[in-house]
A protein has these predicted regions:
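Substrate-binding pocket helix/loop in short-chain dehydrogenase/reductase
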Residues: 106-107, 114-119, 219
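Active-site helix of classical SDR
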Residues: 130, 171, 179
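C-terminal substrate-recognition "lid" of short-chain dehydrogenase/reductases
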Residues: 191, 227-256, 261
Length: 263
């Protein structure tokens, strides 16, 4: 089998040259790593977060590696500001819908404040961002020919249940449903919509959790591959789903969980 390679050793159908990608929650963790990976594949990357200092570091890192990136300071829970920011973009081809939060606690202890906070970011903001991004994609006259891609970052918890994660699981299941429905509805416009559902990863988001030895042991016992995931094991999948290599894939979820949900 012959694999045709493009620049930087990427197979040509994994290249994103000439395309513009928006990454929400792009200041840290999965978002920051994804911004770098998309830029490496040739995309012009727009990195969105509410924290300017985080964005500046990501943009500087991308540019130091020869990529193209710009910062967009925006809190995605501000629906009006989010819509205005995305509507003002010259063009958009790819959305990585990544911002999210978790507050682990027992079901009977969940306060309305925590319930609203998680739903507002994990569901409402994800919907608003996706809607605004697709509206922008559809402004491009050649969208049907060029195609578009949305990748919603969910979780293995969007496929299973877990104690102390009832609200988080609920929101991630919701986005898995949104992904399927968007994939069906937007297929005629050649905008593909998929999700990536990782297991626990080694990120700043999870560091506080893994300081508890019992929790870390609980996680490792449930991953057949026996280890916590690394960011680069997820970003490659995201680039793939955003690229022409995944041109026949829509409305599905790529679960990257070391076997957690197979049991």
């Amino acid at each position: 089998m012959t694999v045709v390679s493009g620049r930087d050793g990427f197979p040509s159908n994994l290249r994103l040259d000439g395309l513009t990608a928006l990454v929400t929650g792009g200041g840290r963790g999965i978002g920051a790593a994804t911004a770098s990976a998309l830029a490496c594949a040739g995309a012009q990357v727009l990195v969105m977060s509410r924290t300017r200092s985080d964005l500046d570091q990501v943009v500087a890192s991308v540019e130091a590696s020869g990529g193209k990136a710009s910062a967009l300071v925006c809190d995605v829970t501000d629906s009006v500001r989010t819509r205005e920011t995305i509507a003002a973009l010259p063009r958009l081809d790819i959305l990585i819908n990544n911002a999210g939060i978790n507050i682990p606690e027992a079901f009977v202890d969940v306060s309305l404040e925590h319930l609203d906070a998680i739903i507002n970011l994990n569901v409402r903001a994800m919907f608003v961002v996706a809607q605004a991004a697709v509206r922008k994609m559809l402004e491009f006259p050649q969208r049907r020919e060029v195609g578009g891609a949305v990748v919603n970052i969910t979780s293995q918890m969007g496929h299973v249940g877990a104690a102390r994660r009832t609200v988080y699981c609920m929101t991630k299941h919701a986005i898995e449903g949104l992904t399927k429905a968007m994939g069906v509805e937007l297929a005629p416009q050649n905008i593909r919509v998929n999700s990536v559902a990782p297991t626990f990863l080694d990120t700043p988001f999870t560091v506080p959790f893994f300081k508890d030895p019992k929790f870390k042991d609980w996680v490792l016992q449930r991953i057949p591959l026996g280890r916590i995931g690394q960011l680069e094991e997820v970003t490659g999948a995201i680039v793939f789903l955003a690229s022409p290599a995944a041109s026949l894939i829509t409305g599905t979820s790529l679960v990257i969980d070391g076997g957690w949900t197979a049991q």
